[in-house]
Amino acid sequence: METVESMRSEGFDIGLRKTIPEAAYLPVAEQTVTREGIPVLANRFAAEAVMQGAHLYSPGVKNCQGLRSGMKATVQDQNGVLVGSGIARQGETAILNYHQGIAVEILSSRFRLPPLRESRWYESGLIHLQSLPSMVACHVLDPMPEDVIVDLNCSPAGKMSYLCQLSDNRARVVGFDRNTRKTEKAREHLERLHCKNYQLIAHDSRYAHLDYTLRADKVLVDPSCTGLGVTPRLSVDTTMADVENLAAYQKQFMRAATALVKKGGTIVYSVCTITGEECEGVVRFAESELGLIETDARPIVGSGCLDSKALSQRFDPELDGAGYFIARFIKP
């Protein structure tokens, strides 16, 4: 609460969620971006970040012909949608050759949000930017002191750090990611938030149950998905083959989680998407093929499921601002 009051005292209109006491939010205003200066083409991911107020970093730039440091610039995506404007902090040669640092300092964006990642509250580990559904998924897992918790898909460690926080840093939290660079980034994040009693393992967690003797009280499965619930989006290029392949991929993590968790232990499956093949399809697989028992995914914060009798929880992008799915299982 002290952090919230500090931010409010400096003009931030901070609100608090009643259902999740650690969740604070800022109202978002949409505005029109006008074209001025040199056009800068950004990839979709960078453009979506700029659209929400982030600065444009050099790795996200695809083209910036004629740009010099100090020039006005307008950032657009590959379809010509204007997402933000500001001042170039590097020239074309430096941006495209070195791929480091801020390319365009954004002064106006489509959605007006302050650059919180550059604030002193963020740098000192007092705040972290995370979606409400992601926080709910951690509450559904219900981490307790002395638990052994495995996060099979930990990068970038947003949920992992929150699990540490919810257990007062007393649970042993083990995070897996197959990419060593990502685990190092996760470590930086966990250190910034002053997390303790955690372990990061660079390993393909689909095979964690075969390669490690670790046994967990609780397992979080938050695998790669089609991401169709992420908002705002500038474009969607997902195919049915993508949906089917990712659903099959997710089932591999559920199989590993089932082997890792102790009898009577908890598995939470969460994805930031809305397809039935991934969400409910993975639930059916977990019950019929893995023998898991689905239980209520509480606390209920999302607007509801496709089936009113379902035990899982859905967030609707139209009603809740983002699409998300959470299911909770017990291993008998």
Where is each model-derived feature located?
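S-adenosylmethionine
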Residues: M1-P332
